[in-house]
Amino acid sequence: MKKNWILLLLLTFSLASLSAQDALYPNTFPLGDVRITAGPFKHACDLNVKVLLQYDTDRLLAPFLREAGLPKKAETYGNWEKDGLDGHIGGHYLTALAIHYAATGNLECKKRMDYMVSEFARVQQANGDGSICGFPNSKKFTEEIRKGNVGIVWNYWVAWYNMHKTYAGLRDAWLYGKNEKAKKIFLKFCDWGVDVISNLDDRQMERMLDNEFGGMNEVYADAWQMTGNPKYLDTAKRFSHKQIFDSMARRIDNLDNKHANTQVPKAVGYQRVAELNSKTAPDYNDFMTAAEFFWETVVSHRSLSLGGNSRGEHFPEAGKCSDYMHERQGPESCNTNNMLKLTEGLFRMHPKVEYADFYERAMYNHILSTQHPEHGGYVYFTPACPSHYRVYSAPGKAMWCCVGTGMENHGKYGQFIYTHDTADNALYVNLFIPSELNWKEKKIKIVQETDFPNEEGTTLTVNPSKATQFKLLIRYPSWVEQGKMQVVCNGVDYAKSAQPGSYIAID
């Protein structure tokens, strides 16, 4: 591709101030306020809705009903859903329904989402203690953890990781799907978790967290933001595995040969704690540094050009990237899903082009390609091994972890195209994707028309319904050469003195 980029703006607005967004994630537009209008990302999202609706909701709920002693309405799925990780896809599926309802307005997604929330309420009530678990012998697990027998985690297939998917699904049904019942269930589930680990000392917590636990620190940070209750912040910090956290906070890379997608969600949690913590808190800098250094380390030293990382699910030793050439299990899709979450979070705090550049690279080259463009199956591994190939899932047959994140991925493409900064009264254009933004607080609609990457340009049209004021910031990608970017508005090129890897401002 020629390194030449032209962006035309049709602006007819006068210029006031932004009201704060009432959202879990600051400076992020509600997913339903951004519509992708054409191109491969719209195709992927629309196709994914069709794939999601091929799954049987009752079969996904069956493990939870079984563990609560309730009659099943259908048989559970096979594969990983019957091998000890029972229920993990149910949480992912709830998130996916909520996201795709927000992204497309599909009412069947909403109907299924609301049904799952109601069923989880039944499960929680039947359990009587606030828990919602789908993995076998879950009550025994809880009893042993309460007694301090944390070694029990090794007798289960990543139980806390599994539960995290349900936590996240309930949070997302509230966040994206506007289901208030889901929030109540989520917080009650959080209270159960606080109670279960309440008698564990720091040594026991560390032993327990040696086993994969997903993003438990992330969801407890979210619970803290929802409620302001400090017990959730305390729990988020307790779920921040010190073995990784302490090294990252000291800017020490200790990731060699560690299971990659065990580590990435931890860093997502570090970022959430830093984002929500007071900058005057004594541990603020540690959480911030841990999140930033983890991102820098993985992106700059442990990722391939497509934005993915890991071989055989583990980070190779530093300097041994040749391992990728001999391993059929290349970068794992789940890892990139979580790296994009981390990138979004860091960008919310410090909107740097390097974050947007990585996001674009990983989304186009890895995440988009993990969906089969015809039947919509999902990919686990993307091998870099010469002459190798990828395997795509079939609905209801393969129930891998990357099926779960794959269900979610293709509804979130609109989440990072545009962001805003309330303090700076600014709108960021981060990605060049045909789309429409309904900026309700400003009473403005913004239309982006482009066929990127098949054409080297995009057009933004700003249509205000009232006089308003804001700063428009357009990404100058690092891959565009110096002097080759043009941002033309009313005949004026605002990019003349701009540098690659920056944002071009129109005030």
Regions flagged by a language model, labelled:
Residues 21-507:
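Glycan-recognition and catalytic cores of secretory/periplasmic carbohydrate-active enzymes
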Residues 1-22:
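Bacterial Sec-dependent N-terminal signal peptides
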